[in-house]
């Protein structure tokens, strides 16, 4: 409600909440910091896990920042921005989601201290933007070039990514799988490599142990052979991929045919059989002994395929058909009549196997496959899910290095280097922006401090030791949470792609700047029916944070 010449002017509908100026900033900063605080304890190899239970009683146990925030039903708009930080980090770099969110939260905490000193938000925003830009330059300077063919480097990065997750005991084994999978699907484009992660399929089955997880250089499909009379194992497979149904098509037009004699009915049935037989004969004629069909297969067609000793699988997903094409070299054919021997793919073995009591089709021994499958095993559903998340992160990290060819030391080392260098840079800039750049530098120390805290170490003492050692020995010194001492992270093999800290700082600073720009929050009241039966809503999103 506003007032004009003493008269109240109603602009917004009844029930609308409004927060202006410092109230709006305080509310948004607090909401964002609560999100950062939620995931902070999961950071690093000694981080804890979160158990999330939804309204249906489904349970997720994880320490993956992006998964935690994705599973939470977050209402506050500023808090939702922090969720976007994690999602962007996950999409662009694959790892460092918790790091990005924690840095964003700390940047806002430091900004609040400056706001309390009456520093204008515009000055803080300018200082943060300068610091973020300088941080990108510094990271490029300290990044080490590596040979993307060096499997040992790739494996160390994958191990670093997996450490601290549920699959930690088998991290060496899982890291090998991640490296091999990425190397297999990487394609050289000019002087660099490109990796399309859509070509790596993750298939999960409960049962066995994590050690039973395996990489199949080919494709695993959660389907079974359509007819009991078909072979369950085909060596030297010639594979046809068909994305039409092996059935008699119904006409587009609605037509009725009057049958006046049994002979006419018999003629119809014989013609139907002839059409199906021609389809199957064509498959046999081109030399295919395995056929994957995206749609259905008629019972009669199944019978003839079985009679000819051809293995057939129906209703295969489009994404699986594309992976089969990349793995075997086959071409997906729309019309069976157009099938030629050149359209067939090859695999040493196609076999139906029982995995955890269910039938699955394994297509293995493909020549230089550009699609692979990681079959994930584990004792419980929660273990299998967490192993999948760990492997997805590891695969993305290896992909980053293969594409960029640059790494940095992990374990808080880059953040400490940035903090030291940004402090020096702040003095060059001068003015009130200097205060914001110094605050940015101080905020980055939250990463080594949190790593130490989560490992049960004294955060202040550890940070002082690490900064002193870092200044003396160079930018690769970080926090060894296992020994509780400063250590050369590069020598210890604790490394990450440079893309991870670069994206984390970029996402965190952009989110902090966006939240600092807001000086007015207007929240409409929810509809009555939503209030009665729904979740807690946006009409009172500030109440829990006041």
From Swiss-Prot:
Pfam families: Cpn60_TCP1 (PF00118). One of its GO terms (biological process) is protein folding. Keywords: ATP-binding, Chaperone, Nucleotide-binding. One of its GO terms (molecular function) is ATP-dependent protein folding chaperone. InterPro entries: Chaperone_TCP-1, Chaperonin_TCP-1_CS, Cpn60/GroEL/TCP-1, GroEL-like_apical_dom_sf, GROEL-like_equatorial_sf, TCP-1-like_intermed_sf, TCP-1_chaperonin, thermosome_alpha. Belongs to the TCP-1 chaperonin family. NCBIfam families: thermosome_alpha (NF041082), thermosome_arch (TIGR02339), thermosome_beta (NF041083). Molecular chaperone; binds unfolded polypeptides in vitro, and has a weak ATPase activity. Forms a Heterooligomeric complex of two stacked eight-membered rings. This is Thermosome subunit beta. It comes from Thermococcus kodakarensis (strain ATCC BAA-918 / JCM 12380 / KOD1) (Pyrococcus kodakaraensis (strain KOD1)).
